[in-house]
UniProtKB/Swiss-Prot annotation:
First-tier enzyme category under EC: transferase
Subcellular location: Cytoplasm
EC number annotated for this UniProt entry: 2.1.2.11
Function: Catalyzes the reversible reaction in which hydroxymethyl group from 5,10-methylenetetrahydrofolate is transferred onto alpha-ketoisovalerate to form ketopantoate.
Name by which UniProt lists this protein: 3-methyl-2-oxobutanoate hydroxymethyltransferase
Gene Ontology terms: biological process: pantothenate biosynthetic process
Cofactor(s) required for function per UniProt: Mg(2+)
GO annotation, cellular component aspect: cytoplasm
UniProt cross-references to Pfam families, sorted A to Z: Pantoate_transf
Oligomeric and partner information: Homodecamer; pentamer of dimers.
Gene Ontology molecular function: any one: magnesium ion binding
């Protein structure tokens, strides 16, 4: 049975951890879905896979293109798509149009927006009223890289309280889940205990209701990984060796036999 947003909330109540990873193409999405991943995020981190230095340049059209491919490969997992930078911050109508296009054109079940400041809370509330499921995202928000950098957030009492307040406000606005990125584990635990919706951690300790990582980091494909990522295999090395072996056989006329 396909995973739903309501099922994620039930899993929090039952104490069942939620498994999430990113995907940007049909093949990886199919593999993740078949392996039992609960939530697949078509993240704007795809920008880095396309050669950009940050997530900012990725466009809505690029996200739509890749989200369609991901959805074609998924039968069970809940698919959530990031709204890219400046496709939802300008106005509520812009956000509704962008999010609506993602749901209508890709087959995804939800969108994710960054930030919990008052204007964003209002935007999310309107999206939810329009029938669009929304996942929130607080802590380190990569679309604010030029304001906040990529350092851990919430280390001071003031910033920790702000992030906690944002998470509570997002729940009240109607999000079905919140990503907690690169914040202290004790703050993530406090938020997880305070809200009734599942928290999905990335660099936020082990007390969240679920975990998400970038799949290229997990598989060892990335040139560099964030400090909180765990590399489970080194596909970059495996692929390099396979290509070198193929090239050697072609040059030596050993392939094809």
């Amino acid at each position: 049975m396909p995973v739903t947003t309501q099922q994620l909330i039930q899993w929090k109540q039952q104490g069942r951890s939620i498994v999430a990873l990113t995907a940007w193409d049909y093949t990886i999405a199919q593999i993740l879905d078949g392996a039992g991943v609960d939530l697949i995020l078509v993240g704007d981190s795809m920008a880095v896979m396309l050669g950009y230095k940050t997530t900012l340049p990725i466009t809505l059209e690029e996200m739509l293109h890749h989200a369609k491919a991901v959805c074609r490969g998924v039968q069970r997992a809940l698919v959530v798509v990031d709204l890219p930078f400046l496709t939802y911050q300008e106005s509520i109508p812009q956000a509704i149009n962008s999010a609506g296009r993602i749901l209508k054109e890709t087959g995804a079940q939800a969108v994710k927006l960054e930030g919990g400041y008052p204007a964003m809370v209002d935007t999310i509330n309107r999206l939810v009223q329009a029938g669009i499921p929304v996942m929130g995202h607080v802590g380190l928000t990569p679309q604010s890289v030029h304001q906040l950098g990529l350092r851990q957030q919430g280390k001071t009492q003031e910033t920790a309280q702000r992030i906690l307040n944002e998470a509570i406000a997002l729940e009240q606005a109607g999000v079905f889940s919140i990503v907690l990125e690169h914040i202290p584990a004790d703050l993530a635990m406090q938020i997880t205990q305070k809200v009734n919706i599942p928290t999905i951690g990335i660099g936020a300790g082990s007390h969240c209701d679920g975990q998400v990582l970038v799949t290229s980091d997990v598989l060892g494909l990335s040139e560099r990984q964030p400090p909180f990522a765990k590399v489970y295999t080194n596909l970059r090395e495996t692929i390099t060796k396979a290509v070198q072996d193929y090239a050697a056989e072609v040059r030596d006329r050993q392939f094809p036999e």
